[in-house]
Regions:
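Active-site-proximal or metal-binding-adjacent scaffold patches in catalytic folds
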Residues: 2-128, 138-179
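Walker B catalytic acidic pair
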Residues: 134
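Walker B beta-strand of ABC/ABC-like P-loop ATPase nucleotide-binding domains
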Residues: 131
């Protein structure tokens, strides 16, 4: 009696974790790219190279520049950093937190943005999409229409970049080479 062989990529491909909620026609195209091992090539052609914001200091400056360009009246950001505790291949891509502390007789709020370390080696547009998303939470806490309108105001290609970032994460989860 022979046991059928199922490849790892078939199992992962069948559910496409990062692409849940997208139309089946689109998922079919992604499955074809994966089967033909062309997903990485397509992404590399569209997004050649990585960014130069590999340190926490550079990421902070990058985030501040975007905030100053689009959200001057938003509360200040006290900390921006890459965080290796964010398990991007399991849950979040970035985190925004508002930490409230008692200082003297007053309550002081501090905003923090943390980005998964996998984005240290990502193409710059993917990092921009994550930072824009987290910055939008300074004004809009929930993922609602106003939130996504703000994301699109800061990055007109936001939805395409989100999809392509999900493709890139799918590629990484399959163990294929990074761009």
């Amino acid at each position: 009696m022979s046991i059928p062989f199922f490849s790892f990529s078939w199992v992962v491909m069948s559910n496409l974790t990062y692409l849940q909620g997208y139309p089946e026609q689109l998922l079919s195209q992604v499955r074809t790219l994966i089967n033909e091992q062309r997903l990485g090539d397509v992404l590399a052609k569209r997004y050649p190279g990585t960014h130069d914001y590999a340190t926490d200091k550079a990421l902070w400056q990058y985030t501040q520049d975007l905030k100053n360009q689009f959200l001057r009246n938003a509360p200040p950001i006290n900390k921006v950093m890459y965080d290796n505790k964010i398990h991007v291949l399991k849950n979040a891509l970035g985190l925004h937190t508002a930490v409230s502390r008692v200082q003297g007789g007053k309550l002081k709020a501090k905003a923090e943005i943390r980005v998964a370390t996998v984005f240290r080696n990502a193409p710059e547009p993917f990092l921009r999409m994550i930072v824009v998303h987290e910055l939008a939470h300074l004004k809009e806490k929930e993922h609602n229409k106003a939130f996504y309108q703000l994301c699109c105001h800061m990055e007109p290609q936001y939805h395409q970049l989100e999809f392509d970032t999900r493709l890139w994460l799918t590629q990484l989860s399959l163990g294929q080479d990074k761009i």
